[in-house]
Amino acid sequence: MKTLVELYDDCPIENVLAADTFRPERTVYLCPSEVAQDKEKQKRLQEYFRHRGMDMETVFLDTSLFHTDKVIRQLQRVVETYPDCAIDIAGGSDAALFAAGYFCRETDIPVFTHSRNLILTL
């Protein structure tokens, strides 16, 4: 996996745990517009990864995490751009999790979830 797709979560650990574990070349965050436009918040995430010794590209894509159709459309665009991706469904809204699970089932894109003690590939 070169590209990790994260469903942005208000809980910071959910936004970094998978990337810190798998160390992909890039992480794409599907996030609300206030995060996609917040350069300071993006900078803090990038600084965290650099501090952890990761030279990883981060991409922030605006989407409504409460509308399944919008999440699915954004995931389609991500897969077109980064066909080597896998999707982490450990964070995000219930609607985004549903959309990502449905999308992965329909497209055969790898999907996983995790906790601090366990990683499950679905």
Segments (PLM) and residue ranges:
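Periplasmic-binding protein-like
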Residues: 86-90
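Long, low-complexity, Lys/Arg-enriched
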Residues: 1-85, 98-122
